[in-house]
Design a protein with these regions (language model features):
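Divalent metal-dependent catalytic cores for phosphoryl transfer on phosphate-bearing substrates
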Residues: 8-15, 33-34, 38-167
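Short, Lys/Arg-rich amphipathic segments at extreme N-termini
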Residues: 2-34
Length: 172
């Protein structure tokens, strides 16, 4: 049976996304659920939520992203200015915490926050959101396809006993 909260959230995020981005978001949700089955089955719903919210500010212009950063008190340093396509991770996490508070918690918001850049010592939850965004099935870039094949071929070959090593190796 479909989770009613997730069904409602899917509908709620749709206005924030272009049609293409919505399709990507649903694919990330499916990938996050698949990865949850391997790594964190008890957190599948939370991973689905993070996936559904991860790009809710992606369609905003750089100017709007900077306005949102100011509104939410997000520091924007020189390095960030050089990579404006990563702003949406910070602003989406902040917007999700405010506008989707009934769905989010700190772990979900951190997963959203680090889904583009990653970070040192990522949690398994954060790594799943990051990886799901990159290897979801609608991604056809050569690097995405190669990494998806690498990850799942290793899981198929080695099983889940080495899952932590496989995740770490995939994140490098």
């Amino acid at each position: 049976m479909e989770n009613e909260r997730i069904t409602k959230l899917r509908a709620a995020v749709k206005p924030y996304l272009t049609d293409k981005r919505y399709a990507h978001t649903l694919a990330v949700e499916q990938e996050a659920a698949a990865l949850a089955g391997i790594y964190l089955p008890e957190k599948e719903e939370k991973l689905r939520i993070a996936a559904l919210l991860h790009d809710i500010t992606k369609k905003e212009s750089t100017e709007k992203q900077l306005q949102m950063c100011a509104e939410f008190g997000i520091m924007v340093d020189e390095d960030a200015i050089l990579a404006p396509k990563t702003f949406h991770a910070k602003t989406a996490a902040a917007l999700a915490a405010r506008d989707f508070a009934a769905y989010t918690d700190e772990e979900i918001c951190r997963g959203i926050r680090y889904h583009t850049t990653g970070r040192a010592d990522m949690t398994v939850f954060e790594a799943i959101v990051y990886l799901a965004d990159y290897i979801e099935q609608t991604r056809t870039f050569a690097d995405c396809v190669t990494l998806r094949q690498y990850f799942y071929s290793r899981i198929a070959k080695e099983g889940t006993a080495n899952r932590d090593i496989i995740l770490r190796d995939t994140m490098i």
